[in-house]
């Protein structure tokens, strides 16, 4: 089928090439032979009057022209899929769908493992690809590259639907031998101490505790930066450094890693974890099914989170 001289099938080929970056893998993903995909590249080059892809170390590297075309092509194909082609109904017990989800290591540990266990019972063929928080999750939502984001609601995009999961609060933690955490932690002492902090992506995007501190006008002395939360408790051992962590994560590590826990010197720093999905997937039966499971499991965590948040917090050590 042609539209203004362009064979629309070539757009499917272009999208596959941008996704896979290898000729054989791209051909396989859309059920073409390798010679047919090579021919498609030739026709694309002729139509757009550009090389589009260059071979470097056995990978196809897109030209600036291809990079510029890719988002519009992906969005057009998604609109066709979602608006013209009917979604297949999801039968959980028979589905082999794979969900791609961006979330922190903290949320994987304290929450999403519950979702995985439930899905394993109800839909054993369903699988997951859990991805690190990166520099531009909004672009990945827009392109349809992701099924879900799970992040604090401060980091949610205004252009895609979202729902709240549960609330948590931040506490300060350190090694049990850290004498500077004895007694009530003052803001002055908090600011004078060395900190371990999680930051994400190539641009070191701040995590929720850094974001909240900056909102209050404070900038800590961060001495160690790590790409996630889960390694922080071990990095505090045998040092006088401190960290600011979600209470749910601290509770998770209590049985295995000795920590001294104190209230944060600022007013209660609470935050809400939220779920977001692409607007284009809003009516997708599979997305709706997974969305409901995630929200149901979150509702079970909320009660325990609220109970933790209401406990009186004196200095404690384990």
Swiss-Prot record:
Named from the GO MF annotations, one term is: DNA-binding transcription factor activity
Q: Record keywords: Repressor included?
A: yes
Q: Which SUPFAM superfamilies match?
A: Periplasmic binding protein-like II (SSF53850), Winged helix' DNA-binding domain (SSF46785)
Where along the sequence lies the DNA-binding region?
23-42
Alphabetical list of InterPro entries matching this protein: LysR-type_TF, LysR_subst-bd, NodD_PBP2, Tscrpt_reg_HTH_LysR, WH-like_DNA-bd_sf, WH_DNA-bd_sf
A Pfam family (short name) is HTH_1
Q: Specify the domain of life of the species encoding this protein.
A: Bacteria
- Every copy of the HTH lysR-type domain together lies at 6-63
The alphabetized UniProt keywords are:
Activator, DNA-binding, Nodulation, Plasmid, Repressor, Transcription, Transcription regulation
| Coiled-coil portions | none
The cross-references to PANTHER family, in alphabetical order and at most eight, read: HTH-TYPE TRANSCRIPTIONAL REGULATOR LEUO (PTHR30118:SF6), HTH-TYPE TRANSCRIPTIONAL REGULATOR LEUO-RELATED (PTHR30118)
Job of this protein: NodD regulates the expression of the nodABCFE genes which encode other nodulation proteins. NodD is also a negative regulator of its own expression. Binds flavonoids as inducers.
The Swiss-Prot or TrEMBL record describes its family as follows: Belongs to the LysR transcriptional regulatory family.
**What's the protein name?**
Nodulation protein D
Q: Which organism is it from?
A: Rhizobium leguminosarum bv. trifolii
Q: Kindly list the organism's lineage.
A: Bacteria, Pseudomonadati, Pseudomonadota, Alphaproteobacteria, Hyphomicrobiales
The gene designation is nodD
